[in-house]
Amino acid sequence: MNGPILFRNIGTLLSGDLAHPMLDATSVLVDGGVIREIGTEPDAETVIDLHGATLAPGFWDSHFHPYFGDYSPRQRVNGAVERTVVSGVTTLISAGAGHQPGMYLPSPTLPNVQAGSAGHGGDPRRARDARGTKALAITMTEAWRTERPSGVKCYAGTVFAEDGFVRDDFVDLAANGIRMLKFQRPISRIADAETYRSWAAELGLLVMTHTGNRSMTKDVASIRDSLRAIDPDIAGHVNGGPTPAPREAVDWLIDHGRAALELVFIGNLRVAAHVLRRAAERDELHRVILGSDLPGGTGVVPGAMLRTIQLLSHLSDVPVELLVCMATGNTARVHRLPGGLVAVGEPADLVAWDPVEASETDDFLDCVAYGDRAYPGLIMIDGVVVHHGNPLLLSPKRMPTIHRNAPALAAGSV
Ligand SMILES: [Zn+2]
């Protein structure tokens, strides 16, 4: 599909921007992979008629765990990324490659598959050193630059903090495209955490914490004190992955930290609703971003992003169009990346949504608020239609149609 593409008959146009989440326009022109015009209807080689359905920026999953290619070893599942894209997600942010078999084993005592592997003769300490975690982060970054199942954008450049890093490691990581340092498992000393934090800031790496029920360093018992020392840019799964931090640490992050507050599908949804309400009271909804924390021990849920939006709409007064911003524009901005918005000049990563066929509702926003399922009928990434029609079991009410206009004949030709 080359040349300009015009989306027309858009019923509801969502922008991904909290300042004006719904745009007063019925058309969007895409060319060269980029949104060129909004609200105009010029001639275009390809016209996509939405028949009144909703057009929105593709969702960003701010907390995904990519492995190699589209295989998830913990679930022994192929195709999780492709199914995630078909469910309306166009961008994945890696929260770290934490579960590569044999490459990063958190603990021989944890009651999970990694402990099982350690029990069979593996040495978990061996995979837990600065050299190994750095090599893995660089390898994943390289691999996901070219591996794009269904065209997905996957930012895989996340490295775990480990004991033993020196400043040159950070220089090397930054030069190799690593964009985020994540405190995942406790490192030994809080002084090292503070040093890593300053190197990350110096070299332009974002800092994310595994925000849960354990301290980030071994020499500090208080979860809150370790969070204070690390001063994260992003408090990863502040509602737990799966168990949240104590409420006083969560409230400290909201009231005194400056971090983006990430809420994930697999966490504690009551705590997520609490964070959302507090952020709304503080007029700080721009700090909230949404993710899945999948695939992982909890399973593979390709529709997790929409489901999280829906559940949070039931548990709070925040309208669906604002929750969509937390899964699109907010995330792009927090990660300092382009996209997540329906705006001129932004990448054309777009999804056409409509209520499931049998729903009593007739509009995507009403459908999600009501509690029915909505489905994408068309998904575009970088101006390329990667899915049309619905390969999932159920269909949206209004399926977009694609019309190709014959190219204009050159003057003088017959
Ligand atoms: Zn995670």
Where in the sequence are the language-model features?
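N-terminal metal-binding scaffold of metallo-dependent hydrolase/deaminase domains
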Residues: M1-P42
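Metal-associated gating/positioning segment near the N- to mid-region
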Residues: A44, L50-A135
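Active-site mouth loops of central-metabolism enzymes
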Residues: S62-Q75, K153-V166, R185, G212
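Short, acidic/polar
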Residues: P73-V81, E162-L173, K218-S226
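Alpha-helix-loop-beta-strand connector modules within alpha/beta enzyme cores
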Residues: P111-S117, A130-V152, W199-T209
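Active-site core of metal-dependent hydrolases
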Residues: H120, N176-G299, S316
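His/Asp/Glu-enriched, well-ordered alpha-helical/loop segment
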Residues: R277-V356
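C-terminal cap of metal-dependent C-N hydrolases
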Residues: A348-T401
